[in-house]
Amino acid sequence: MKQSHFFAHLSRLKLINRWPLMRNVRTENVSEHSLQVAMVAHALAAIKNRKFGGNVNAERIALLAMYHDASEVLTGDLPTPVKYFNSQIAQEYKAIEKIAQQKLVNMVPEELRDIFAPLIDEHAYSDEEKSLVKQADALCAYLKCLEELAAGNNEFLLAKTRLEATLEARRSQEMDYFMEVFVPSFHLSLDEISQDSPL
């Protein structure tokens, strides 16, 4: 049986820090970010289905979100201001991401490739799936800003403002629900969020 380096590569996502140009009170790596995006994307899909008549596969959405930044293990996490400096750079970076995604897919043993390719290659996502993952990705970046600001790090003030504009552009009923029900707790301390649920 031929060896595959696929999961050895993915395990290195924990070595890639996000927000590399920003001073962070607590660093965040791509692996933990991907887990949070998967949880939030799953919640958005579940909310969409349960509250707003949606019909999406919440478990698939969670898997797509889990792998949404997998190519960064080969490309690194390019800071957003650089990635979107102009349309030419954004277009070239998309092409690089596509190559990295394909390289990852090619690492998977052939008998399993049809399972992993649709998770890694974002071109296999439906528009609705892509929208939910992007909403979750932006929400998690926004939550990171809230956490940094709550810790007194004003470095994230402009990022928060930019992300509020992004969230407004991607706004949906399920996002509004999530923002109203879950986000306010991110402004609270551990003691405050633990008061109602003692062990």
Swiss-Prot record:
It is found in: Cytoplasm. Its cofactor is a divalent metal cation. Signal peptide: none annotated. The record marks R18 as: Appears to be important in orienting the phosphate for catalysis. SUPFAM superfamilies: HD-domain/PDEase-like. Residues 30-142 form the HD domain. Keywords: Cytoplasm, Hydrolase, Metal-binding, Nucleotide-binding. GO terms for molecular function: 5'-deoxynucleotidase activity; metal ion binding; nucleotide binding. Its EC number is 3.1.3.89. The keyword Hydrolase applies. Substrate binds at R18, W19, H33, D69, D77, L78, P79, T80, D137. One of its GO terms (cellular component) is cytoplasm. SMART domains: HDc (SM00471). Pfam families: YfbR-like. It catalyses: a 2'-deoxyribonucleoside 5'-phosphate + H2O = a 2'-deoxyribonucleoside + phosphate. It is an enzyme of class 3 (hydrolase). A divalent metal cation binds at H33, H68, D69, D137. It comes from the Bacteria. Catalyzes the strictly specific dephosphorylation of 2'-deoxyribonucleoside 5'-monophosphates. Belongs to the 5DNU family. NCBIfam families: PRK03826.1. Homodimer. This is 5'-deoxynucleotidase YfbR.
